[in-house]
Amino acid sequence: MSVMRTGIIAKKLGMTRLFREDGTHVPVTVLHMDDVRVVAARTKERDGYAAVQLGFGHAKTKNVTKPMKGHFAAAKVEPANRLVEFRVADDAVLEAGQVLSAAHFTVGQKVDVAGISKGKGFAGGMKRWNFRGLEASHGVSISHRSLGSTGNRQDPGKTFKNKKMAGHLGGERITTLNLEVAAIDEARNLIMIKGAVPGAKDGYVLVRDAVKTARPADAAYPAALKA
């Protein structure tokens, strides 16, 4: 059995906590799958690679362009608010119109979650890269939070590309690995992930099987679909 099955797209609702039977509690992030359905399938014979295109939510018809209206009409599905594509194995390609369930993942399973991190604006080296900063006294004037040397002297006499310096922080795609699925609410299409996931509230995240941990044997393959 191949390990490459589709992931899912979900909206981050926020954080809460779950209580266990022994009285302890665990912080969780609640993710909502809003009618996640297959919009298109990619096959090696036709497209050169195998993948599944998923749609999330529902878009207003007036906001959908004519080319995209034709794309959704060909799949016989309603226009989606978001589209995302996952590479899959040849035997894990799904048919257009199929709807994924929150039971796609199992409790205790490890997953990787990708999202757009919160934008922090322009940040200095200490906040952006955890630099130590300079001395608080002992001859240091006005440069307590500065970077220090960036280009040496005559040799090399320049600042190398990708040097860690002050600049824009956040607002980029971040993937957190090996997060644990704490609970599943299949009736309400909710997935609860232990701990924090990247991004702000109401942001979109991609959840897939962990690449560094084996998929549970009882996980649905190629996907958990709604009847």
From Swiss-Prot:
The keyword Ribonucleoprotein applies. GO terms for molecular function: rRNA binding; structural constituent of ribosome. InterPro entries: Ribosomal_uL3, Ribosomal_uL3_bac/org-type, Ribosomal_uL3_CS, Transl_B-barrel_sf. PROSITE patterns: RIBOSOMAL_L3 (PS00474). The keyword Aminoacyl-tRNA synthetase does not apply. One of its GO terms (cellular component) is cytosolic large ribosomal subunit. Methylated by PrmB. The modification N5-methylglutamine is found at Q154. Keywords: Methylation, Ribonucleoprotein, Ribosomal protein, RNA-binding, rRNA-binding. It holds the Pfam family Ribosomal_L3. Gene3D superfamilies: 3.30.160.810, Translation factors. It comes from the Bacteria. Part of the 50S ribosomal subunit. Forms a cluster with proteins L14 and L19. One of the primary rRNA binding proteins, it binds directly near the 3'-end of the 23S rRNA, where it nucleates assembly of the 50S subunit. Belongs to the universal ribosomal protein uL3 family. This is Large ribosomal subunit protein uL3. The lineage of its organism: Bacteria, Pseudomonadati, Pseudomonadota, Alphaproteobacteria, Acetobacterales. The gene is rplC.
